[in-house]
């Protein structure tokens, strides 16, 4: 799908500069006619959340030979959030139209987003007032990122076409869309579903191990709890499924997120009490 107007796109991730997911996404968007700049960690940075690098230097370098020649790429020794901050402050001469993060190797559903470097890179774009998209392939075993990249191209076209309808109060307030794509052939996809954030938990275990020198270390492992009741959201109709539910039904999920985490119900309840110094 050729865009009516080529967009200026910044792409980052948390899987690192050599990851197939970001290479597939960046090259596909460049082939579609967009101006693409990649700034991402120089190594694996999964589950770093919204961490920043403080009190030590951040090193960067231009990367050649990995991406399509039309893509400008940088690697950064910092976190995904560092990468987006660096790109916006020191690399890009013009403000990007969108910040994209991914394609992550594995899902970012429900409460995963609190730990996700992928979502945090997109959240950094949102904090800077830029429309942002986090993309994840919801399968740790598959390396077929192309369907998710193709969907990103189509989604950007649709977002630009529908902009007057999804801009909040016609003020074009920035939006963050967290997108998860099932590992299914296109004809087997159930469709695209707007979802609310769900709940995801793991059976976690710290495995005690020993290194070759006999020193003890621990390795965190875990399995997803599949049958977990999903929470109700008083401000969202119940006919909106959670991202966890919709991905299980074979849908591409689009979950709008924000960085304001107020608990409105508790604010109202606690404000009715008399609190003493």
Swiss-Prot record:
The lineage of its organism: Bacteria, Bacillati, Cyanobacteriota, Cyanophyceae, Oscillatoriophycideae. It catalyses: a ribonucleoside 5'-phosphate + H2O = a ribonucleoside + phosphate. It comes from the Bacteria. It is found in: Cytoplasm. Keywords: Cytoplasm, Hydrolase, Metal-binding, Nucleotide-binding. Pfam families: SurE (PF01975). Belongs to the SurE nucleotidase family. InterPro entries: SurE, SurE-like_Pase/nucleotidase, SurE-like_sf. It comes from Picosynechococcus sp. (strain ATCC 27264 / PCC 7002 / PR-6) (Agmenellum quadruplicatum). It is an enzyme of class 3 (hydrolase). Its cofactor is a divalent metal cation. This is 5'-nucleotidase SurE.
């Amino acid at each position: 799908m050729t865009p009516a107007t080529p967009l200026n796109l910044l792409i980052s991730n948390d899987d690192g500069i050599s990851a197939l997911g970001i290479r597939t996404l960046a090259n596909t968007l460049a082939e579609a006619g967009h101006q693409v700049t990649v700034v991402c960690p120089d190594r694996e940075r999964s589950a770093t959340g919204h961490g920043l690098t403080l009190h030590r230097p951040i090193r960067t370098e231009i990367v050649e030979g990995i991406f399509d020649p039309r893509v400008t790429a940088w690697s950064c020794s910092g976190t995904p959030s560092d990468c987006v901050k660096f790109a916006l402050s020191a690399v890009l001469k013009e403000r990007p139209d969108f910040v994209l993060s991914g394609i992550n190797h594995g899902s970012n559903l429900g409460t995963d987003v609190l730990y996700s470097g992928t979502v945090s890179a997109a959240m950094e774009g949102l904090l800077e007032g830029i429309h942002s998209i986090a993309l994840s392939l919801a399968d740790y075993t598959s390396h077929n990122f192309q369907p998710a990249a193709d969907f990103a191209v189509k989604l950007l076209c649709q977002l630009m076409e529908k902009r007057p309808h999804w801009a909040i109060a016609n003020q074009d307030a920035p939006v963050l869309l967290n997108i998860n794509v099932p590992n299914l052939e296109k004809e087997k996809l159930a469709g695209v579903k707007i979802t609310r954030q769900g709940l995801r938990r793991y059976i976690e275990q710290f495995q005690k191990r020993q290194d070759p020198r006999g020193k003890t270390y621990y390795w965190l492992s875990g399995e997803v709890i599949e049958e977990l009741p999903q929470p109700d959201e008083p401000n969202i109709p119940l006919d909106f499924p959670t991202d966890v539910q919709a991905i299980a039904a074979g849908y591409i999920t689009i979950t709008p997120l924000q960085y304001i985490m107020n608990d409105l119900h508790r604010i109202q309840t606690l404000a009715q009490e008399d609190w003493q110094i």
